Amino acid sequence: LIELGLDYATQPIRTRTLDMEDPTFLALHPRGKIPILEDGGLEVSESPAIVTYLSETYGGDATQLIPNTPWARAKYFEWMSFISMELDATSLYVLRRHVDLHETYGEAPAANDTAREYFLRMIQSAVPALPSEGNFLLGNDFSGADILMISCLNFSDRYDFTLPSEITAYRERVSARPTYQAALEANNP
């Protein structure tokens, strides 16, 4: 939202709290998942869908977060899928459930070890896919894929991963952007 210069209001809801069981929240999002975006009379959930919707609805030439050419657009969706499935769902979400939320989901040391190993293997596999020119996942143009990647990298901090130097350098470039700093401040007052 900050990246696109949009005004917005948030309603913080912490995961696996009573807020997520509130009938008003469940009426809005029956799956009981966060994040969810309300825009006018529309509701959109799941981070990749939210980023894509916002970019396609509000992105202009200077703030377009999704490329327009078929090849670049395919690479965008390739990164979005990789980040969502391989980094987040397959590894970080397992750790979140069985480390952070073990009281709810139970302890699973073998699953945790496998998830850690998988995350490291997948993040290492991302290194050769980084463009040789430019600061971002799609080269010179910052995109919605960078938003998802930096979110996953930030979330991975709680598990003390040692990231490849190329990923650390990428992260530093994205983190130095003024809109990133503004979003970080807005989300962590």
Predicted regions and their residues:
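Conserved beta-strand edge residues that scaffold enzyme active sites
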Residues: T15-R16, Y170, N188
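Charged/polar, low-hydrophobicity segments characteristic of intrinsically disordered regions
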Residues: F119, P178-P189
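Phosphate-coordinating loops and pocket residues in cytosolic domains that bind phosphorylated ligands
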Residues: E21, A27, M149, A176, ...
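GST-like fold's C-terminal all-alpha helical module
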Residues: W79, I83-A176
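Short, hydrophobic secondary-structure boundary micro-motifs
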Residues: A62-N68, T90-Y93, N135-N140, Q181-A186
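GST-like domain detector, emphasizing the conserved glutathione-binding G-site
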Residues: I2-A110
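Active-site-flanking alpha-helical
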Residues: S55, C152-L153, L184
